[in-house]
């Protein structure tokens, strides 16, 4: 079968200052809350961090996260424990984004990696919206694997953190039999993801 080339889009990222022990004086920088929302402008590939902090308190990216999924988010959360993460308000870097994600439809890796992110970051307990977001992603991954009763447990947990979390309702649709791939494709068309 002939496959069309993967669609590519350019996404503007913002420069992140993750400096341990001292603030970077730059006009217009704004702190971001990485527990509440996974902010695309706060990306490890654009982080500026002192070498001693990278190899010391923060540490390098964890290569053992299941499937390598969310390893950048895990790193940014670790960095944020040591210093607020600030982003520059204007795009300073172009990053190519391949719409055909390496992680697309790798539900067991999603589930394991995101569960590990929750386990490693007890701070999520103080941020219900953020906890619901990640719990909802886990619920989607479980539902997509066809584990309906377990998905329903995770959907209930997600809604317990925040009834406004859309991934809980998406996981419910998937558990009811709507293919996750179809929902994911529809969201991707709108620039969103599961």
Language model segments and positions:
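Conserved nucleotide-sugar donor-binding catalytic segment
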Residues: 12, 16-108
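Short helix-capping and inter-helix turn/linker motifs at the boundaries of alpha-helical repeat units
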Residues: 66, 129-130
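A short, conserved acidic/glycine-rich loop-to-beta-strand motif
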Residues: 1-14
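Catalytic core of nucleotide-sugar-dependent glycosyltransferases
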Residues: 91, 95-98, 103-129, 148-161
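N-terminal cationic leader/targeting segments used for protein routing and processing
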Residues: 3-4, 52, 189
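Membrane-interface aromatic/basic loop that binds lipid-linked glycans or pyrophosphate carriers
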Residues: 123, 143, 147-194
